[in-house]
């Protein structure tokens, strides 16, 4: 099968499309024929070998296969798999999604609704679950709250705007002026152009700040949080930060939070079948719409990763494998 691989960390030029052996599923695993995949910041950081936290967690590259988000059709299942069978259309997360076939744990998959295209389904897993869990589980969002989304026009942000509106919140989106029309079309009630205004110095107060840019520390955001407001960080790994700077900032924020009625939470999304199914149902109903900026083929993955590295994508970058 064809797959994107790399043997050393570096820029997108380290990626190559090669013929490798088709994998075989273990007990709890599913082999899917990949119809579409999507690019995440995680893929870019792992390829580059930075920020430093990724070198600590994943080590240096030997032979690695990028890609996490996937959607496709089940080709084979392991002997202990009970939830899926050959021929089922599914979406979820795996390692090595930028390939014609991928192995996926059955716990990281959900059925793909019939009316949802594979590319739309592939755009959802990491980004939509980050938005959902950041708002609902960690941000404890409630109807009528004022919610600010910093980094609102990216993959997670475009889902977060829509989900916050579904939850009944008033949404302020922070993005560049060229993305104002997009975020308003997704439901944002107010838009702040970060080049013209710093939300942390404004007069508005927010019950929840979902920070996807990682450029406003908790100590700064406290000024615009309500007395029991919550600052949820899901973009703290942005940029080439050293381990000492990264952990120093997190420890400082968590200590401030512990002795304040205002709270700081940092998290990484946990993929699970229940949340994936909920997202799939929302997309199928038309209440939640994946925003796809650009589409690429498998051999164009280096180009997609290069664009990801500009941090200017509006929504998601999708890799199509149906051609």
State where each predicted segment sits:
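A structural motif shared across PLP-dependent enzymes of the aminotransferase-like
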Residues: 94-106
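Short helix-loop-beta connector
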Residues: 85, 114-117, 140-146
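A short acidic, Gly/Pro-enriched loop at the edge of an enzyme's catalytic core
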Residues: 201-208
């Amino acid at each position: 099968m064809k797959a994107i691989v790399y043997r050393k960390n570096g820029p997108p030029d380290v990626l190559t499309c090669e013929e490798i052996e088709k994998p075989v599923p273990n007990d709890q695993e599913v082999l899917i024929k990949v119809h579409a995949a999507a690019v995440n910041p995680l893929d870019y950081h792992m390829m580059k070998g930075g920020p430093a936290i990724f070198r600590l967690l994943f080590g240096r590259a030997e032979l690695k296969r990028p890609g996490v988000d996937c959607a496709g059709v089940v080709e084979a299942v392991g002997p202990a798999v009970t939830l899926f069978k050959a021929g089922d259309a599914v979406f979820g997360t795996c390692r090595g999604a930028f390939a014609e076939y991928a192995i996926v744990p059955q716990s990281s998959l959900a059925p793909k609704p019939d009316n949802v295209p594979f590319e739309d389904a592939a755009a959802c897993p990491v980004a939509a679950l980050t938005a959902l869990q950041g708002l609902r589980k960690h941000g404890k969002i409630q109807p009528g709250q004022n919610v600010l989304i910093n980094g609102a026009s990216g993959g997670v942000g475009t889902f977060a705007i829509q989900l916050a509106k579904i939850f009944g919140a008033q949404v302020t989106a922070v993005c560049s002026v060229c993305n104002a029309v997009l975020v308003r079309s997704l439901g944002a009630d107010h838009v702040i152009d970060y080049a013209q205004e710093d939300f942390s110095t404004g007069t508005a107060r927010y019950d929840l700040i979902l920070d996807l840019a990682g450029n406003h520390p908790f100590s700064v955001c406290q000024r615009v949080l309500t007395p029991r407001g919550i600052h949820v960080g899901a973009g703290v790994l942005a940029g080439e930060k050293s381990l000492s700077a990264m952990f120093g900032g997190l420890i400082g924020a968590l200590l401030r939070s512990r002795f304040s009625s205002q709270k700081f939470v940092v998290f990484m999304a946990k993929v699970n079948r229940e949340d994936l199914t909920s997202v799939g149902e929302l997309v199928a109903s038309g209440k939640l719409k994946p925003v796809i900026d650009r589409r690429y083929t498998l051999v164009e993955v280096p180009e997609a990763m290069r664009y990801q590295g500009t941090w200017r994508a509006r929504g998601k970058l999708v890799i199509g494998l149906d051609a």
